[in-house]
Regions:
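N-terminal secretory signal peptides that target proteins for export/translocation
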Residues: 1-15
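N-terminal soluble domains immediately following signal/targeting peptides that reside
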Residues: 36-179
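Bacterial N-terminal signal peptides
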Residues: 20-31
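Serine/proline-rich low-complexity intrinsically disordered segments, especially terminal tails, linkers
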Residues: 17, 31-35, 155
Length: 179
């Protein structure tokens, strides 16, 4: 950037706002790329798979956040990308912190299928029998919120008539699924 700026002549009276803007953009890009894992957000998708006749629940977290949470909450440290025990521990952690209930308050209990790391993301998979899909009335998801109170867990419930998005913050207990 400095070489580019040195080679340009500035017209008399012209400001250096353009150069300042470029430098600000460069610094912003660097700061975003170095702290991307600190977004403290997770995404969960719940949808019915008619072929398998299962409700598929897929949670996406930043792998670095998962490692940090395991170290802080459970005292378990290591590389989640190479240690299957850490991956399994985080899957169990998410399963404990995610809940579904029906309109009467009865728990629907998703089965933990597994977890995997792909790139920067850690994926946790759960499933329910298809018959439970229409019964989902409330969703709870407070994963990582005891580590980061500002953690936002977004849940997309995909149905035939569209997607319902719930955003759980501040250790929301259970949020009602909108009609």
């Amino acid at each position: 950037v400095a070489a580019w700026c040195a080679g340009r002549r500035r017209a008399p009276g012209r400001s250096t706002t353009r150069v300042g803007g470029l430098l600000a953009l460069l610094l912003l890009t660097l700061s975003v790329s170095t702290s991307a894992h600190q977004l403290q957000a997770a995404l969960t998708t719940i949808e019915l798979n008619p072929r398998s006749e299962l409700v598929e629940i897929v949670h996406r977290f930043y792998a670095h956040d998962a490692e940090h949470a395991l170290a802080e909450v459970a005292g378990i440290e290591g590389d989640i990308r190479t240690d299957p025990a850490l991956l399994e521990a985080f899957g169990r952690y998410v399963a404990r912190h995610f809940s579904l209930t029906d309109a009467e308050g009865n728990a629907l209990e998703p089965e933990l299928v597994g977890a995997e790391v792909e790139g920067d993301f850690l994926w946790v998979y759960q499933q329910l029998p298809a018959g439970d899909f229409g019964r989902i009335a409330r969703i709870g998801h407070d994963s990582l919120q005891e580590v980061w109170p500002q953690q936002e867990n977004r849940v997309n419930l995909r149905r035939d008539d569209g997607v319902r998005t719930l955003i759980l913050r501040n250790r929301d207990n259970r949020v009602a699924v909108p009609d």
